[in-house]
Amino acid sequence: MMTYEIKTKISNSYERKCEKYRISHHVFDYQPDIKYMDGIRKIDPYLFLSDDSKKTLGKYHKPLDIIDAVEDYFEVFYDELCDSLNNNDNSENENSDKKLKKN
């Protein structure tokens, strides 16, 4: 059986804000067919699967536990994306206001 362990990667600025999201876990536990071994690549995405730094996902977790963890990941991702978009919108509005005042 092959196990791929993926550790989180976080940029330095994000790491300072969200230190609690750093975890490591097992994403895939499977036994591939030998003839397909060349086509298998280890993936290494940015993952945030838990706000508890001691929580891990192992091969004995129930499917609903994994689904809950993935759901948490997307909630955090969506929140961060919305915050980023809101910050960009606010800075664009400030720049527009400055241009209007100059004219």
Swiss-Prot record:
Source domain of life: Viruses
Protein name as catalogued: Uncharacterized protein L78
Record organism: Acanthamoeba polyphaga mimivirus (APMV)
